[in-house]
């Protein structure tokens, strides 16, 4: 069982039902799969697609992604990658330096165990997001196959970028963070 698949199945059924009940009326559906919110989970085969992808470390990976985005003209060729921790030279809102646990530690300062853990967490996150993309695609495929895609407005909004799950020590136990 996976929630995102179930929500997609139910969304498709909702549209089918709406079109049976009132075929000429528009419908409104708010589809919220919750992807990349905790808990991070995805079918194993989606996670394994990313096995080893992040072993190089996050600094090197973000450089590769940024270069690819420039090649795709998402960013102009002259764009520069932002610093990993842009605020460390500034004071925190309380007037003090940024706390060490509020910044991303350089990959080469992590232990081998931390590197394995954080690389695996990135694999799970990526698998979760890719699986969600697949399920959104399945919903769009249904709209196309049922002849409704051309008469449907789809608005895709995300409130997530990176995830705070795992925190600076890798624990997904949120209570532990506050103790």
Where are the regions a protein language model picked out?
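Active-site-proximal cap/lid insertion segments
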Residues: 1-179
